[in-house]
Amino acid sequence: MARYFRRRKFCRFTAENVTEIDYKDIVTLKNYVTESGKIVPSRITGTRAKYQRQLARAIKRARYLALLPYTDLHNK
C-alpha cells in the first residue's frame, strides 16, 4: 500500500500577521466556504480558533449583506 504525503496544516492568517478578517474581502472568504455554502471547519483548513471565529463572523456578515450566497445556485 502506498502512503500519501499529508501536507502540514497551518493558519494562513497567523503567517500573514492579519489583525482582523474583513467581511468585504470576498476572495479570501470564498476559500473558506464550500460549494454548498457551508463554512469549512478549522480542523480541515488549519485555521486557529481566534481566526476561525472571526472568519465565521465575517462570512455571516457577508451573507447578510448579499456579498456571499447562503447556498449554491439551484439549477433545474
From Swiss-Prot:
Protein name stated in the entry: Small ribosomal subunit protein bS18
Disulfide-linked positions: none
Lineage: Bacteria, Pseudomonadati, Pseudomonadota, Gammaproteobacteria, Aeromonadales
Origin superkingdom: Bacteria
Pfam families in the cross-refs: Ribosomal_S18 (PF01084)
Residue stretches in coiled coil: none
Quaternary structure and interacting proteins, as annotated: Part of the 30S ribosomal subunit. Forms a tight heterodimer with protein bS6.
Organism: Aeromonas salmonicida (strain A449)
Similarity annotation: Belongs to the bacterial ribosomal protein bS18 family.
